From Swiss-Prot:
Subcellular location per the Swiss-Prot or TrEMBL entry: Cytoplasm
Xref: InterPro entries: NagB/RpiA_transferase-like, SorC_transcr_regulators, Sugar-bd_dom_put, WH-like_DNA-bd_sf
Record lineage: Bacteria, Pseudomonadati, Pseudomonadota, Gammaproteobacteria, Enterobacterales
DNA-binding region of this protein: 32-55
Naturally occurring in which organism (per UniProt): Salmonella typhimurium (strain LT2 / SGSC1412 / ATCC 700720)
Protein's name in the database: Transcriptional regulator LsrR
Protein backbone atom coordinates (compact mmCIF):
# COMPACT_ATOMS: atom_id res chain seq x y z
CA UNK A 1 0.00 0.00 0.00
CA UNK A 2 1.38 3.43 -0.96
CA UNK A 3 1.63 6.65 1.03
CA UNK A 4 -1.53 7.84 -0.77
CA UNK A 5 -3.70 5.73 1.54
CA UNK A 6 -5.85 8.16 3.51
CA UNK A 7 -7.82 5.90 5.80
CA UNK A 8 -8.30 2.19 6.35
CA UNK A 9 -11.38 0.15 5.47
CA UNK A 10 -12.38 0.16 9.13
CA UNK A 11 -12.11 3.91 9.64
CA UNK A 12 -15.36 4.87 7.88
CA UNK A 13 -18.98 3.85 7.83
CA UNK A 14 -20.22 2.48 4.51
CA UNK A 15 -22.10 5.64 3.56
CA UNK A 16 -18.95 7.72 4.05
CA UNK A 17 -17.01 5.23 1.93
CA UNK A 18 -19.58 5.58 -0.86
CA UNK A 19 -19.48 9.38 -0.66
CA UNK A 20 -15.66 9.52 -0.77
CA UNK A 21 -15.45 7.00 -3.61
CA UNK A 22 -18.07 8.92 -5.62
CA UNK A 23 -16.21 12.19 -5.10
CA UNK A 24 -12.87 10.76 -6.15
CA UNK A 25 -14.39 8.95 -9.15
CA UNK A 26 -16.72 11.60 -10.59
CA UNK A 27 -15.23 14.86 -9.31
CA UNK A 28 -11.49 14.15 -9.26
CA UNK A 29 -11.47 11.71 -12.17
CA UNK A 30 -9.53 8.98 -10.35
CA UNK A 31 -9.74 5.43 -11.64
CA UNK A 32 -11.19 2.67 -9.48
CA UNK A 33 -7.69 1.25 -9.03
CA UNK A 34 -6.37 4.62 -7.81
CA UNK A 35 -9.29 4.95 -5.40
CA UNK A 36 -8.77 1.44 -4.05
CA UNK A 37 -5.13 2.24 -3.34
CA UNK A 38 -5.94 5.60 -1.78
CA UNK A 39 -8.65 4.24 0.53
CA UNK A 40 -7.06 0.90 1.27
CA UNK A 41 -9.91 -1.07 -0.31
CA UNK A 42 -9.92 -3.76 -2.96
CA UNK A 43 -10.87 -2.66 -6.46
CA UNK A 44 -13.83 -5.05 -6.34
CA UNK A 45 -15.15 -3.35 -3.20
CA UNK A 46 -14.79 0.08 -4.81
CA UNK A 47 -16.83 -1.14 -7.78
CA UNK A 48 -19.50 -2.67 -5.53
CA UNK A 49 -19.79 0.49 -3.41
CA UNK A 50 -20.20 2.64 -6.53
CA UNK A 51 -23.05 0.38 -7.66
CA UNK A 52 -24.58 0.47 -4.19
CA UNK A 53 -24.37 4.26 -4.24
CA UNK A 54 -26.40 4.35 -7.46
CA UNK A 55 -29.02 1.90 -6.15
CA UNK A 56 -29.46 3.72 -2.84
CA UNK A 57 -29.72 7.17 -4.40
CA UNK A 58 -26.54 8.52 -2.77
CA UNK A 59 -25.03 8.86 -6.25
CA UNK A 60 -27.17 10.57 -8.88
CA UNK A 61 -25.79 11.31 -12.33
CA UNK A 62 -26.98 14.47 -14.10
CA UNK A 63 -26.33 14.85 -17.81
CA UNK A 64 -26.40 18.44 -19.06
CA UNK A 65 -27.17 18.16 -22.75
CA UNK A 66 -29.90 19.42 -25.05
CA UNK A 67 -30.50 15.77 -26.00
CA UNK A 68 -30.86 14.46 -22.44
CA UNK A 69 -34.38 13.20 -21.84
CA UNK A 70 -35.62 14.60 -25.15
CA UNK A 71 -36.37 17.99 -23.60
CA UNK A 72 -38.44 19.24 -26.52
CA UNK A 73 -40.90 16.36 -26.14
CA UNK A 74 -40.91 16.71 -22.38
CA UNK A 75 -41.75 20.41 -22.51
CA UNK A 76 -44.50 19.91 -25.10
CA UNK A 77 -46.20 17.13 -23.13
CA UNK A 78 -45.76 18.84 -19.77
CA UNK A 79 -47.45 21.97 -21.06
CA UNK A 80 -50.23 20.22 -23.01
CA UNK A 81 -51.30 17.91 -20.17
CA UNK A 82 -50.21 20.07 -17.20
CA UNK A 83 -47.96 17.30 -15.90
CA UNK A 84 -46.05 17.67 -12.63
CA UNK A 85 -43.13 15.69 -13.97
CA UNK A 86 -42.12 13.85 -17.13
CA UNK A 87 -39.14 11.89 -18.36
CA UNK A 88 -38.75 10.92 -22.01
CA UNK A 89 -35.97 8.40 -22.54
CA UNK A 90 -33.81 8.90 -25.67
CA UNK A 91 -34.14 6.22 -28.34
CA UNK A 92 -31.66 3.36 -28.00
CA UNK A 93 -31.94 0.73 -30.76
CA UNK A 94 -32.17 -2.92 -29.67
CA UNK A 95 -32.39 -1.98 -25.97
CA UNK A 96 -34.93 -3.58 -23.62
CA UNK A 97 -37.59 -0.87 -23.43
CA UNK A 98 -39.20 -2.37 -20.32
CA UNK A 99 -35.92 -2.32 -18.43
CA UNK A 100 -35.15 1.26 -19.53
CA UNK A 101 -38.60 2.47 -18.48
CA UNK A 102 -38.16 0.84 -15.08
CA UNK A 103 -34.80 2.53 -14.60
CA UNK A 104 -36.24 5.89 -15.68
CA UNK A 105 -39.18 5.58 -13.29
CA UNK A 106 -36.87 4.53 -10.47
CA UNK A 107 -34.75 7.65 -11.00
CA UNK A 108 -37.85 9.86 -10.96
CA UNK A 109 -38.95 8.34 -7.66
CA UNK A 110 -35.47 8.68 -6.15
CA UNK A 111 -35.61 12.40 -6.91
CA UNK A 112 -39.06 12.93 -5.38
CA UNK A 113 -39.48 10.51 -2.46
CA UNK A 114 -38.30 11.49 1.00
CA UNK A 115 -37.23 9.11 3.80
CA UNK A 116 -40.05 7.03 5.30
CA UNK A 117 -42.64 8.21 2.77
CA UNK A 118 -45.35 5.87 1.47
CA UNK A 119 -45.31 4.61 -2.13
CA UNK A 120 -48.41 2.95 -3.62
CA UNK A 121 -47.75 0.46 -6.41
CA UNK A 122 -49.96 -0.91 -9.17
CA UNK A 123 -49.44 -4.30 -10.83
CA UNK A 124 -47.71 -4.78 -14.18
CA UNK A 125 -44.33 -5.46 -15.75
CA UNK A 126 -43.21 -1.81 -15.84
CA UNK A 127 -43.97 -1.17 -12.18
CA UNK A 128 -42.32 -4.39 -11.04
CA UNK A 129 -39.19 -3.55 -13.05
CA UNK A 130 -39.19 -0.17 -11.31
CA UNK A 131 -39.35 -1.82 -7.88
CA UNK A 132 -36.40 -4.05 -8.72
CA UNK A 133 -34.31 -0.99 -9.60
CA UNK A 134 -35.50 0.79 -6.44
CA UNK A 135 -34.72 -2.00 -3.98
CA UNK A 136 -31.55 -0.45 -2.56
CA UNK A 137 -33.11 3.01 -2.34
CA UNK A 138 -36.23 1.65 -0.60
CA UNK A 139 -34.08 -0.01 2.06
CA UNK A 140 -31.73 2.95 2.53
CA UNK A 141 -34.53 5.54 2.74
CA UNK A 142 -36.97 3.30 4.66
CA UNK A 143 -39.68 3.83 2.04
CA UNK A 144 -42.95 2.08 2.90
CA UNK A 145 -44.92 0.26 0.19
CA UNK A 146 -48.60 -0.49 -0.29
CA UNK A 147 -50.34 -2.24 -3.18
CA UNK A 148 -53.13 -0.51 -5.09
CA UNK A 149 -55.01 -3.68 -5.93
CA UNK A 150 -55.58 -7.22 -4.80
CA UNK A 151 -53.53 -10.14 -6.01
CA UNK A 152 -50.21 -11.31 -4.57
CA UNK A 153 -48.76 -13.02 -7.65
CA UNK A 154 -48.62 -9.94 -9.91
CA UNK A 155 -46.56 -8.09 -7.30
CA UNK A 156 -44.07 -10.74 -6.25
CA UNK A 157 -41.55 -10.24 -9.07
CA UNK A 158 -40.91 -6.76 -7.67
CA UNK A 159 -41.69 -7.08 -3.97
CA UNK A 160 -39.81 -10.37 -3.77
CA UNK A 161 -36.57 -8.50 -4.55
CA UNK A 162 -36.89 -6.20 -1.53
CA UNK A 163 -35.11 -6.53 1.80
CA UNK A 164 -37.11 -8.60 4.28
CA UNK A 165 -37.18 -5.63 6.67
CA UNK A 166 -39.03 -3.40 4.18
CA UNK A 167 -42.53 -2.33 5.21
CA UNK A 168 -45.01 -3.69 2.63
CA UNK A 169 -48.81 -3.68 2.94
CA UNK A 170 -50.35 -6.17 0.51
CA UNK A 171 -54.10 -6.26 -0.08
CA UNK A 172 -55.23 -9.68 1.24
CA UNK A 173 -57.58 -10.46 -1.64
CA UNK A 174 -57.47 -11.49 -5.30
CA UNK A 175 -57.25 -8.81 -7.96
CA UNK A 176 -60.52 -10.03 -9.49
CA UNK A 177 -63.22 -11.96 -7.66
CA UNK A 178 -65.39 -14.58 -9.36
CA UNK A 179 -68.54 -12.49 -8.92
CA UNK A 180 -69.71 -9.00 -8.03
CA UNK A 181 -71.15 -10.29 -4.75
CA UNK A 182 -67.88 -11.87 -3.62
CA UNK A 183 -65.96 -8.75 -4.62
CA UNK A 184 -68.31 -6.60 -2.55
CA UNK A 185 -67.88 -8.88 0.46
CA UNK A 186 -64.09 -8.80 0.18
CA UNK A 187 -63.99 -5.02 -0.19
CA UNK A 188 -65.90 -4.71 3.08
CA UNK A 189 -63.42 -6.86 5.00
CA UNK A 190 -61.53 -4.73 7.53
CA UNK A 191 -58.14 -6.07 6.42
CA UNK A 192 -58.83 -5.17 2.79
CA UNK A 193 -60.42 -1.81 3.56
CA UNK A 194 -57.47 -0.83 5.77
CA UNK A 195 -55.00 -1.42 2.93
CA UNK A 196 -57.20 0.58 0.54
CA UNK A 197 -57.29 3.51 2.96
CA UNK A 198 -53.51 3.27 3.39
CA UNK A 199 -53.06 3.35 -0.39
CA UNK A 200 -55.24 6.45 -0.69
CA UNK A 201 -52.97 8.18 1.85
CA UNK A 202 -49.78 7.45 -0.13
CA UNK A 203 -47.30 10.23 -0.91
CA UNK A 204 -46.81 8.92 -4.44
CA UNK A 205 -48.04 6.11 -6.67
CA UNK A 206 -46.70 4.33 -9.72
CA UNK A 207 -48.95 2.56 -12.23
CA UNK A 208 -48.62 0.83 -15.56
CA UNK A 209 -50.85 1.70 -18.51
CA UNK A 210 -52.24 -1.11 -20.63
CA UNK A 211 -53.39 -0.70 -24.24
CA UNK A 212 -56.30 -2.60 -25.76
CA UNK A 213 -54.39 -2.91 -29.06
CA UNK A 214 -51.62 -4.87 -27.35
CA UNK A 215 -53.91 -7.89 -27.73
CA UNK A 216 -52.17 -11.01 -26.41
CA UNK A 217 -49.24 -8.95 -25.07
CA UNK A 218 -51.42 -7.03 -22.60
CA UNK A 219 -50.35 -7.75 -19.00
CA UNK A 220 -53.93 -8.10 -17.79
CA UNK A 221 -54.58 -10.77 -20.43
CA UNK A 222 -51.27 -12.59 -19.94
CA UNK A 223 -51.95 -12.71 -16.20
CA UNK A 224 -55.32 -14.36 -16.83
CA UNK A 225 -57.51 -11.60 -15.38
CA UNK A 226 -59.50 -11.20 -18.59
CA UNK A 227 -60.12 -13.58 -21.48
CA UNK A 228 -59.51 -12.87 -25.16
CA UNK A 229 -63.28 -12.73 -25.64
CA UNK A 230 -63.62 -10.10 -22.91
CA UNK A 231 -60.76 -8.13 -24.43
CA UNK A 232 -62.50 -8.07 -27.83
CA UNK A 233 -65.81 -7.04 -26.27
CA UNK A 234 -64.20 -4.28 -24.21
CA UNK A 235 -62.43 -2.99 -27.32
CA UNK A 236 -65.71 -2.89 -29.24
CA UNK A 237 -67.17 -0.72 -26.49
CA UNK A 238 -64.55 1.91 -27.25
CA UNK A 239 -61.82 1.14 -24.71
CA UNK A 240 -58.28 2.18 -25.62
CA UNK A 241 -56.48 1.34 -22.38
CA UNK A 242 -56.61 0.42 -18.73
CA UNK A 243 -55.03 1.21 -15.38
CA UNK A 244 -55.42 -1.25 -12.49
CA UNK A 245 -57.89 -3.22 -14.63
CA UNK A 246 -60.27 -0.29 -15.19
CA UNK A 247 -60.82 0.38 -18.90
CA UNK A 248 -61.32 3.85 -20.38
CA UNK A 249 -62.01 5.39 -23.79
CA UNK A 250 -59.94 7.88 -25.80
CA UNK A 251 -61.26 10.77 -23.68
CA UNK A 252 -60.30 9.07 -20.42
CA UNK A 253 -63.89 8.17 -19.52
CA UNK A 254 -64.45 4.83 -17.78
CA UNK A 255 -66.26 2.36 -20.05
CA UNK A 256 -69.67 1.60 -18.47
CA UNK A 257 -71.30 -1.81 -18.00
CA UNK A 258 -68.16 -3.95 -18.04
CA UNK A 259 -68.29 -7.05 -15.85
CA UNK A 260 -64.68 -6.88 -14.64
CA UNK A 261 -65.18 -3.39 -13.16
CA UNK A 262 -67.64 -4.82 -10.63
CA UNK A 263 -65.32 -7.70 -9.75
CA UNK A 264 -62.05 -5.83 -9.18
CA UNK A 265 -60.68 -5.42 -5.67
CA UNK A 266 -58.56 -2.34 -5.17
CA UNK A 267 -58.60 1.40 -5.59
CA UNK A 268 -60.87 2.81 -8.28
CA UNK A 269 -59.26 5.26 -10.66
CA UNK A 270 -61.04 8.29 -9.22
CA UNK A 271 -59.53 7.42 -5.83
CA UNK A 272 -56.04 8.02 -7.22
CA UNK A 273 -56.81 11.74 -7.06
CA UNK A 274 -56.09 11.71 -3.30
CA UNK A 275 -52.44 10.81 -4.02
CA UNK A 276 -50.28 13.91 -4.74
CA UNK A 277 -48.11 12.30 -7.42
CA UNK A 278 -49.25 9.44 -9.67
CA UNK A 279 -46.60 8.32 -12.15
CA UNK A 280 -47.65 6.42 -15.26
CA UNK A 281 -44.94 4.19 -16.75
CA UNK A 282 -45.54 3.00 -20.30
CA UNK A 283 -43.77 2.78 -23.63
CA UNK A 284 -44.17 1.47 -27.14
CA UNK A 285 -45.95 3.34 -29.92
CA UNK A 286 -48.97 1.03 -29.66
CA UNK A 287 -49.60 2.51 -26.19
CA UNK A 288 -49.70 6.14 -27.34
CA UNK A 289 -53.52 6.42 -27.41
CA UNK A 290 -53.85 4.73 -24.01
CA UNK A 291 -51.27 7.09 -22.48
CA UNK A 292 -53.05 10.12 -23.94
CA UNK A 293 -56.37 8.89 -22.53
CA UNK A 294 -54.83 8.32 -19.08
CA UNK A 295 -53.59 11.92 -19.06
CA UNK A 296 -56.90 13.28 -20.37
CA UNK A 297 -58.71 11.42 -17.59
CA UNK A 298 -56.30 12.94 -15.02
CA UNK A 299 -55.50 9.48 -13.69
CA UNK A 300 -51.78 10.29 -13.80
CA UNK A 301 -49.94 13.60 -13.37
CA UNK A 302 -46.42 12.36 -14.16
CA UNK A 303 -45.13 10.19 -16.99
CA UNK A 304 -42.12 8.06 -17.90
CA UNK A 305 -42.03 6.98 -21.54
CA UNK A 306 -39.64 6.61 -24.48
CA UNK A 307 -38.78 8.93 -27.35
CA UNK A 308 -40.69 7.11 -30.10
CA UNK A 309 -43.83 6.90 -27.98
CA UNK A 310 -43.59 10.57 -27.04
CA UNK A 311 -43.26 11.46 -30.72
CA UNK A 312 -46.34 9.38 -31.55
CA UNK A 313 -48.31 11.07 -28.74
CA UNK A 314 -47.43 14.52 -30.06
CA UNK A 315 -48.33 13.45 -33.60
CA UNK A 316 -51.78 12.33 -32.39
CA UNK A 317 -52.58 15.40 -30.30
CA UNK A 318 -51.47 17.78 -33.06
CA UNK A 319 -53.81 16.26 -35.67
Amino acid sequence: MSDNTLVSDYGMCEEEQVARIAWFYYHDGLTQSEISERLGLTRLKVSRLLEKGHQSGIIRVQINSRFEGCLEYENALRNHFALQNIRVLPALPDADIGLRLGIGAAHMLMESLRPQQLLAVGFGEATMTTLKRLSGFISAQQIRLVTLSGGVGPYMTGIGQLDAACSVSIMPAPLRASSQEIACTLRNENSVRDVMLTAQAADAAIVGIGAINQKDQASILKSGYITQGEQLMIGRKGAVGDILGYFFDAHGEIIPDIKIHNELIGLKLNSLSTIPTVIGVAGGEQKAEAIIAAMRGNYINALVTDQKTAGKIIQIIEK
